[in-house]
Amino acid sequence: MCIRDSNIGRVIARPFIGEYDNFVRTYDRKDFGMNPPGETILSYLYKNNLSTYGIGKISDLFGEMFLTTAVHTEGDSNGLEYLHNEAKNGNHDFIFVNLVDLDMLYGHREDPHGYYEGLKLIDRKIQGILDVMSENDLIIFTGDHGTDPTDGKTDHSREYVPMVAYKKNGKAEYIGDLEGFYNVASTICDFFELNNIFPGKSFLNRI
């Protein structure tokens, strides 16, 4: 089904457990997606001999391609533990992490208290990751959509998503609204001193 002629980008197998009126989504989701139609930052880094590490459902999203190492996770705490260990040990050049709990467990389920607690957990884990980063590391946090747990709907919401980039001894600067993830890709190219093949503009010098 996931072929360009059909324009079906992804088929998701999403298992649940529990009884009627009390179903819970498990972490055994499987995404069957169409391969990216062009170069991505992941494929570009991989083809330039940089080691890549996918944490979470990254492997599914990119057709199980262009990853030196990939691991499946059981929630945000587990994913951030993998990130902490990798940031500390430094075995790969590029780490791509997908965190799902705020969306899957709380946003879609209209659970603002759970969302709040999940965000606090992420905040606690992030501090440990920042502590083990070297001065040569760059970390970028962002998202591809919102899932407002208070809007009375169970679908994705359309607000602007945050983007926070951090380096030790870096600047504390607001860089304004950015249009498109390609600006992140261009910044990563700049960070690894590769030619920028994407339409965006690097903001590395403002971090």
Each model region followed by its residue ranges:
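Feature captures the catalytic ectodomains and active-site-proximal regions of enzymes
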Residues: R4-I207
